[in-house]
Amino acid sequence: MGKIIGIDLGTTNSCVAIMEGGQPKVIENAEGARTTPSIIGYTEDGEILCGAPAKRQAVTNPKNTLYAVKRLIGRRFEEKEVQKDISLMPFKIVKADNGDAWVEARDKKIAPPQVSAEVLRKMKKTAEDYLGEEVTEAVITVPAYFNDSQRQATKDAGRIAGLEVKRIINEPTAAALAFGMDKTSKSDRKIAVYDLGGGTFDISIIEIANVDGETQFEVLATNGDTFLGGEDFDQRLIDYIIDEFKKESGVNLKADVLALQRLKEAAEKAKIELSSSQQTEVNLPYITADASGPKHLALKITRAKFESLVDELIERTMAPCVTALKDAGCKISDIDDIILVGGQSRMPKVQEKVKEIFGKEPRKDVNPDEAVAVGAAIQGGVLQGEVKDVLLLDVTPLSLGIETLGGIMTKLIQKNTTIPTKASQTFSTADDNQAAVTIHVLQGEREVASGNKSLGQFNLEGIPPAPRGTPQIEVIFDIDANGIMHVTAKDKATGKENKITIKANSGLSEAEIQAMVKDAELHAEEDKKAHELADARNQADGMVHMVKKSLTEYGDKLDASEKAAIEAAIKDVEDVLRDGDKETITAKTEALSAAAQKLGEKMYAQQQAEGAAAGATGQQAEAGEKTVEGDVVDAEFTEVNKDKK
């Protein structure tokens, strides 16, 4: 049985971990880093780059380099958060045929799960390279406040990447697992996980209890904002730099996508530096040019200035914290530990705010970038039976219900209900002789149906004619351990029922997912061929270099015809090196190897002759030494014997 890997699929960075010898281990990627930028670049020649290589070419290829796509996953194009991002991103966010928010690169529409699948594939490959075996199963984390559509879309991304997603777990819960696994406290403790990542914010109140020798992680409440994170902090800094540059030079950089990409990189770097320094300088020579010539950007930014720019964003994390505490039935004094997760939580001002909310210092012994992947790996170990005596009780973050008469949402499952769970309620018809009912499934906290997220709708038909209010329609909601919902509607009189696994009235269809899986497999085949071609080129190049070197040293030992044949074979290889296919390059390399055989024989013969000559000289010298040494030994031996007599 293969390993179940744990993947933190982040907005800005992603991370992969496994269980090894009973302990979680974060795996370094091919570039030697423990986290991978969640960035995908589509190059002109059709190559798909992921991680650091994609980030490096972003400045010269801004329209085809996709980042922060997790903010769009499972979202509709019309949503105000999506509309806000359209003006900020250098790449195109477009409306799909089903109304979802998709992206565009190289004139091709791409679904966010397809982009996320490229990141997941990189994580999968990282684990496979380390383990030396194929990986097909994973636990993937999502923000606790992700709705059903976003969870389903994440699961789809896993499938496209060739992974069976064994479990979707919430990021704060995963971080709690990572924190609590090595704590052997006998008493129960309540912890707050404050997770401010690249694109999302979550707060979860979790109780870690020891129940009959089993460590139980129970999520008491969760809250958050799925459109608040480090990317927004970067944007505040970018906007400030643009405004300052405009004041100074009169040039607006907002329309210049190349300049914006350089600014994004510089802003992210400056933000990180300001967590450890009081001041930093953004220096971007040749940022743009006008009629008067090139323009350079040089701007000093203090920590205080940056804090004032993002103060409102930090403030926005307060209300969810207060709500989560209230929903959990906890007072601030009940919280034993506060854990910080997500790169943005490293900002000193954020840590100050957390201390202000909870009245105590947050812990610093949890790595904010790796804790979530570590927790996912532990959950993988639990599912595999490798980690024992751990029970995870997660919750559904938002209430679930259906639309009833008057456009009202009737809740069947309240928010923060432990999952998996099941609930049912009986409804009836609104009109006389109504033959069908439409079950409109909603997720959210508003009383008015239109104020909540529509997860989908389906019909139950064939209801026998009867006065309104007479038929008994039972609606059953069933949420699995991934937080994904299955809904059944049943006419109690006839036994007729209809059921669906909720897919947003958008979302990817099964056919689309299958097409994307095939496309991914095709790319994998292309990648393999590209790898084999690169290997063939390297081998050919090495052979040419070696033969040329040998020809310089030993070419005078060859006949003119032999030398000409080798030189011709070298030229043949050099001619196909750039544009030839793998088979042609391999054939020409083998032909060169055969032609160079004669040269090899001459080299070997000369080396043998030189070796023999050197050996003969050495033997003579050694014999002389031995004679002298032998005389001495004999004389000494004789002396001793004489004395003994």
From Swiss-Prot:
UniProt entry tagged with the keyword Chaperone: yes
Residue stretches of biased makeup (Low complexity): 605-622
Region Disordered: start-end pairs: 604-645
Residues found modified as Phosphothreonine: T200
Record key words, sorted: ATP-binding, Chaperone, Nucleotide-binding, Phosphoprotein, Stress response
Matching PANTHER family: HEAT SHOCK PROTEIN 70KDA
Functional note: Acts as a chaperone.
Family from the record: Belongs to the heat shock protein 70 family.
HAMAP family xref list: DnaK
Protein name, per record: Chaperone protein DnaK
Name of the encoding gene: dnaK
